[in-house]
């Protein structure tokens, strides 16, 4: 019986899950938009949202906690220098999960995970039109 067991197993052992979500959060912070399967996207919220909440208060202790979970100095820097101030007035709900169909090989449901309020990339056609 699986009473009081929270979180998805995703057919991985605990160390593999931990490493996978550490890498996924790092990619999300770096690129602000990633594509993954829907169950992984839903589980990613449990790892990413507390880190963004942590980054709202920039202190040495919070940076060390974030580094302990991410193990990437540049990602921690972006988390505290850009994302923390961006979501200062937002009480939660930093991620948006958008379903985007099914994967070609195995029909797994896919989803985009993006940070809410991320700056829109400037299209190359717009840049050339201005010149």
From Swiss-Prot:
Family matches, as Gene3D superfamilies: Ribosomal protein L17
BP GO terms, sorted: translation
Residue ranges of coiled coil: none
DNA damage among keywords: no
Keywords for this protein: Ribonucleoprotein, Ribosomal protein
GO CC list: cytosolic large ribosomal subunit
MF GO annotations: structural constituent of ribosome
Pfam families, A to Z: Ribosomal_L17
Recorded family membership: Belongs to the bacterial ribosomal protein bL17 family.
Record note on quaternary structure: Part of the 50S ribosomal subunit. Contacts protein L32.
Name under which the protein is recorded: Large ribosomal subunit protein bL17
Gene: rplQ
């Amino acid at each position: 019986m699986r009473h009081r067991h929270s979180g998805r197993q995703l057919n991985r052992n605990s160390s593999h899950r931990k490493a996978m979500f550490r890498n996924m959060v790092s990619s999300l912070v770096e690129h602000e938009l990633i594509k993954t399967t829907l169950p992984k996207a839903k589980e990613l919220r449990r790892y990413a949202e507390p880190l963004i909440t942590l980054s709202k208060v920039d202190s040495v202790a919070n940076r060390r906690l974030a580094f302990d979970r991410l193990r990437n100095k540049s990602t921690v820097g972006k988390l505290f220098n850009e994302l923390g101030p961006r979501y200062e007035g937002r009480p939660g709900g930093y991620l948006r999960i958008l379903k985007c169909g099914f994967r070609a090989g195995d029909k797994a449901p896919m989803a985009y995970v993006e940070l809410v309020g991320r700056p829109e990339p400037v299209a190359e056609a717009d840049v050339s039109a201005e010149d």
